[in-house]
């Protein structure tokens, strides 16, 4: 479980932008946003503080995952693993029907595995894939209060780790206690950390019809190499619905290296509306991570949720 928590600390967050990507096969070909111009934003009297406060105080993003239990839907999950030359050496494809009409049922419509996916004991080769299953297959079966104090671990080791996992995903900007060497590096909205980042915001259109703001936080280009190397979050992009200022998407680009581990990851989560309820529609991940005495892990995910239908009696 500790290894899963560490991995997730290196791979959270959200929304594809013009950042540095790992040069290999990318399963995500779904384009969702068209940008307009920064000029439109200035006329709206918006400022950086309003966007940051919205990110810190938002609860709707996690609630969208909680809302999934009220719906039946189809999930298509694709996982790719890579060798040291970034050639695909393993594939997983799952098409799953999640049925919440009455007692919850999960039906595999398609289940395909190719290449080096499992160990001899039947467990996944990569902690990356194990993390993926643990978090996103169970996202709407857990409780989470974004602004609650960090867990003291009294609920048991596993429960403490789960609290950290959920905080990393759904409440960016908070420090994560109990994760050595990187727990404080997620706290990017402090006065000290803000001096290292540029902030820009644009107007755009999401899914061809939803008017949105795109708020981007990125490392200043004129910093020294030493300073840049010490900043874990290279870029954080958040998509806001103009009509209600709720968050529809998040993207993060993270890279960090020290004596204990080395990672380079990008992750994206997107939402949409079904019967006026916000629900997750796409999750993507590209990442490499490495730590001593273990094989370097290289993987990408594409998760698409579709055909949401309100479950009977929900």
Which residues does each PLM region occupy?
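Gly/Pro-enriched, hydrophobic low-complexity segments
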Residues: 186-192, 208-313
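Alpha-helix boundary/interfacial micro-motifs
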Residues: 14-15, 19, 61, 260-261, ...
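Structured extracytoplasmic
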Residues: 22-212, 217-226, 297-314
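Bacterial Sec-dependent N-terminal signal peptides
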Residues: 1-26
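Residues embedded in well-ordered secondary-structure elements
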Residues: 8, 13, 27-29, 204, ...
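Compositionally biased, low-structure terminal segments
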Residues: 14-16, 182, 246
């Amino acid at each position: 479980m500790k290894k899963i928590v560490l991995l997730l600390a290196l791979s959270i967050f959200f929304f594809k932008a013009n950042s540095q990507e790992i040069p290999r096969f990318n399963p995500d070909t779904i384009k969702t946003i068209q940008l307009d111009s920064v000029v439109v934003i200035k006329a709206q009297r918006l400022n950086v503080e309003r966007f940051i406060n919205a990110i810190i105080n938002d609860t709707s993003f996690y609630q969208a995952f909680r809302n999934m239990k009220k719906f039946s839907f189809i999930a298509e999950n694709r996982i790719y693993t890579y060798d040291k030359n970034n050639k695909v050496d393993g594939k997983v494809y799952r098409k799953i029907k999640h049925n919440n009409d009455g007692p919850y049922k999960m039906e595999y419509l398609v289940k395909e595995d190719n290449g080096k996916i499992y160990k001899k004991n039947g467990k996944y080769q990569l902690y990356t894939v194990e993390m993926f299953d643990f978090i996103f297959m169970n996202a709407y079966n857990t409780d989470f209060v974004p602004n609650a104090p960090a867990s003291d671990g009294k609920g048991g080791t596993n429960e403490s780790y789960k609290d950290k996992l959920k905080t990393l995903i759904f409440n960016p900007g908070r420090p994560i206690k109990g994760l050595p060497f990187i727990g404080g590096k997620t706290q990017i909205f402090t006065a000290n950390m803000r001096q290292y980042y540029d902030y820009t915001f644009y107007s755009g259109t999401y899914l061809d019809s939803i008017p949105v703001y795109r708020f981007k936080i990125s490392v200043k280009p004129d910093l020294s190499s030493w300073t840049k190397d010490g900043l874990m979050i290279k870029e954080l992009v958040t998509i806001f619905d103009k009509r209600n200022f709720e968050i529809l998407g998040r993207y993060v680009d993270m890279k960090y290296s020290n004596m204990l581990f080395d990672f380079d990851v990008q992750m994206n989560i997107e939402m949409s509306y079904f019967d006026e309820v916000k629900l997750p529609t796409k999750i993507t991940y590209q990442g490499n991570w490495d730590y001593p005495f273990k094989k370097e892990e290289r993987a990408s995910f594409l998760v698409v949720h579709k055909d949401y239908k309100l479950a009977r009696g929900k």
